[in-house]
Curated annotation (Swiss-Prot):
Alphabetical keyword list: Metal-binding, Ribonucleoprotein, Ribosomal protein, RNA-binding, rRNA-binding, Zinc
GO molecular function annotation: metal ion binding; rRNA binding; structural constituent of ribosome
InterPro entries membership: Ribosomal_bL28/bL31-like_sf, Ribosomal_bL31, Ribosomal_bL31_A, Ribosomal_bL31_sf
Protein name, as recorded: Large ribosomal subunit protein bL31
Protein family according to the UniProt entry: Belongs to the bacterial ribosomal protein bL31 family. Type A subfamily.
Cofactor note: Binds 1 zinc ion per subunit.
Cofactor list: Zn(2+)
Binding site for Zn(2+): C16, C18, C36, C39
Subunit-level organization: Part of the 50S ribosomal subunit.
Biological function: Binds the 23S rRNA.
Lineage of the organism: Bacteria, Bacillati, Bacillota, Clostridia, Natranaerobiales
Gene Ontology BP terms: translation
GO cellular component, one term: ribonucleoprotein complex
Position of the signal peptide: none
Length: 66
């Protein structure tokens, strides 16, 4: 690696939209994320079903799943 051309790697604070925050390493001082391991459905075990415009009901009617 060439000297003095790489950005400085430092501790960074990661802030999630849910309010959780933690530290990691990055070239930026602060990172803002929308979802983290504290609020992601895979890690929490809670599944969220997002129905945009009744698509789920339309699918169920189409294939007779109601």
């Amino acid at each position: 690696m060439k000297r003095e051309i790489h950005p400085e790697y430092k501790k960074a604070k990661v802030v999630c939209a849910c309010g959780n925050s933690f530290e990691t390493g990055s070239t930026k001082e602060e990172l803002k994320v929308e979802i983290c391991s504290s609020c992601h459905p895979f890690f929490t075990g809670k599944q969220k079903l997002v129905d945009s415009g009744g698509r789920v009901e339309k699918f169920k009617r189409k294939y007779g799943l109601e």
